[in-house]
Amino acid sequence: MKVHEFQAKKILKGYGVPIPRGEVAKTAAKAKKIAEKLGGKVVIKAQIHAGGRGKGGGVKVASTPDEAQQLAKKIIGMNLVTHQTGPEGKKVKQVLVEEELEVVKELYLGIVVDRAQAQPVIMVSEAGGMEIEEIAAKSPEKILKVAVDPTTGFMGFHARKLAFGLGLEKELNKQATTMISQLYKIFVEKDATLVEVNPLVITKDDRLLALDAKMTFDDDALYRHPDLKELYDPDELEPLEVEASKYKLNYIKLDGNVGCMVNGAGLAMATMDIIKLAGGNPANFLDVGGGASAEQVENAFRILLADKNVKVVLINIFGGILRCDRVATGIVEAAKKVELKLPIVVRLEGTNVEEGRRILKESGLKFEVAVDFRDAADKVANLTKSF
C-alpha cells in the first residue's frame, strides 16, 4: 500500500525525523490560509501516488498567500502526467503547502527489501533530487548500499558508515546517523517495503530535513497496523484494481494491449515474460488464485474486457486446485454476458483439461485454443499485429 507524501511525513515526524512546516489543502482558499500562517515563500505540492511531480508541473513556489491560492487553484483538479503515471495521468485532489527552505545541498536516503539478498538494503547518495534515477542507471557507483542482516538487526556501525558515505561534517554527520536509525526503525516496525527520503536536504542554517518522502507498506501486514489502514486512499488506485479487490482478485494494470488471466503469481509473471519475448505487450497482471470459483473467473474476465487498451486476451491456466472445467465454465458464462468482440486465446493444462476444452468447443463461441505455452504467446503476438 502506498501513501501520500504528507502522510509519510507525518509518520517521519512521529519518529522524530525533521520535516518542513506545512499542511494539506483540498481547496485554493485553504492553501492561502496555510500560506498566511507559514509566512514567507511556500511550496505548493500536488499529492498523488507517483514521482516526477516537479517535472510534470505539480510543484510550484509561491511568494505570497495570494499567489499560493492562484497556484493551488491550477494544481487542484489538474490531470498530472509524470513518467510514473503513464500517459493517462492522475487527477490531483489535494496539495501540500510547505515553507520554502534555503537548501544548500540535496542528498538521497532510501531503504528497500532486496529480494536477491533476502535482506533490507539502505542506500545513500550525495547526489539526491530529481535526477537520482538517472544517477542510479548511469553512475551506480555514486550510491552507497549497506545490507542489514535481519537476524542481527540494524547496528550503530551501519548508521555511521552510511552517514560518512554522505560526506557530511561532524554535526550533520550526527544528525544523519540519528535519522538513518529512525528510518530503519520505521521500516521494521511498520512492515514497510520502501522508505525513501528524496531529497534529504542540508539547509543554510545547517539542519538536515526530509524535504520529500515516499513510503510503501506490505499489504499482507496491514492487519497489524490499523493506523496505516486508515491512510488507504482508494481514489489513487486504478478503478479496475478497486473492482478486482472486491472479488479477491490480484490485479495490477499495465500499459500494454494483451489482457492476461492466469492462476498463480509465478505463472502470471512467466506469462507476461513470454508475451514480451514473443513480441506482445501485457496489459495487466491478473492472478485468479488456486481456488477461484466460476463466478470469480467470470468477474476476472469482465475486468479484463473493461480495459479499453486490451485488444487480445490470453487465458493461461494450469489446473490443479483450480480445475480447467471450472475455468472454462466461467469464461463461457462471462463471454455470453458481454458483447464479445476481442479475440480470446486459451491455454489449459492439468486437472480436467479435456472437460475444459470440451466446454469451450461446445460453447458456440470462437476461442483460439493453444496447444502449449509458447503456442499461446505466439498466437497472441500475431493477433496484436493487426491492431
Regions found by a protein language model. Name each.
Residues 311-349:
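C-terminal hydrophobic structural anchor segments
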Residues 1-196, 201-315, 349-350, 354-361, ...:
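ATP-dependent carboxylate/acyl-activation modules
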